Amino acid sequence: MTESHDTPITPDGEARPHRRIKSFVMRAGRMTEGQQRGLDQGGPLYILPLADSPVDYDQVFGRSAPRTLEIGFGMGHSLLEMAAAAPEQDFIGVEVHRPGVGALLNGVLTQGLKNLRVYDCDAIEVLNRCVADNSLDRLMLFFPDPWHKARHHKRRIVQLEFAELVRRKLKPGGVFHMATDWEPYAEYMLEVMSAAPGYRNRAADGTYVPRPEERPITKFERRGERLGHGVWDLKFEKVD
């Protein structure tokens, strides 16, 4: 859900101060014991503060390694699985849903992972303020809110402005990997990314890539497959 540039108008016709639409929608949720443990014990160790200048992630992780950032990891199952399967890589997750952050950190504590850190704030702020240009090997955006209604399309996170922000943060050859289970949104993302300068579609036919093995299948996705629902993956590589 990207920034909106609409200026609300008051009943007397005066413009209100601009309110930026953030990259997320807050949803309430009860905290389980495990999720609370994750926040209480894992938060001080693995949640990174929002910085005012680019972060030296080599220092954060204590090494130089391929680096992936995921926006909106939900309950964290896929990100946790990917980090556990690739200990030679470093992962950064961004999520504002507190139960999801707690669930991921509980898993990090349980598995003893050292290659994963979290931001619990707006992803746009994280990219703009914390992530240096040309520093990410991969950025993942899986199953973002499609904002089905036409009047809400401006809230979709995948826009040309966002694509340019991601391109700046990726290293040359870095990949922006998106996935959605709603075909109209897949078509929309393909249209936006095909028009975004500085990218090359990794799909041989210029559309969607086969489901990559490195992206874990979620329970939601398995249920959708049983019901005949599709999932569309897009991979765009930074070329300059």
Curated annotation (Swiss-Prot):
Gene name per UniProt: trmB
Catalytic residues of the enzyme: D145
Binding-site list for substrate: K149, D181, T218, K219, F220, E221
Spans annotated as Disordered: 1-20
Family annotation (PANTHER family): 3-DEOXY-D-MANNO-OCTULOSONIC-ACID TRANSFERASE/TRNA GUANINE-N 7 - -METHYLTRANSFERASE, PENTACOTRIPEPTIDE-REPEAT REGION OF PRORP DOMAIN-CONTAINING PROTEIN
Pfam families with a match to the protein in the record: Methyltransf_4 (PF02390)
Family: Belongs to the class I-like SAM-binding methyltransferase superfamily. TrmB family.
Annotated positions binding S-adenosyl-L-methionine: E70, E95, D122, D145
Reactions listed under catalytic activity: guanosine(46) in tRNA + S-adenosyl-L-methionine = N(7)-methylguanosine(46) in tRNA + S-adenosyl-L-homocysteine
Entry-linked SUPFAM superfamilies: S-adenosyl-L-methionine-dependent methyltransferases
Entry EC no(s): 2.1.1.33
Pathway(s) this gene product operates in, as recorded in its UniProt entry: tRNA modification; N(7)-methylguanine-tRNA biosynthesis
GO cellular component, one term: tRNA methyltransferase complex
InterPro entries named in the record: SAM-dependent_MTases_sf, tRNA_(Gua-N-7)_MeTrfase_Trmb, tRNA_methyltr_TrmB_bact
Keywords: Methyltransferase, S-adenosyl-L-methionine, Transferase, tRNA processing
Gene3D superfamilies, per database record: Vaccinia Virus protein VP39
Origin: domain of life: Bacteria
The protein, known as: tRNA (guanine-N(7)-)-methyltransferase
GO molecular function: tRNA (guanine(46)-N7)-methyltransferase activity
CDD domains: AdoMet_MTases
Its biological purpose: Catalyzes the formation of N(7)-methylguanine at position 46 (m7G46) in tRNA.
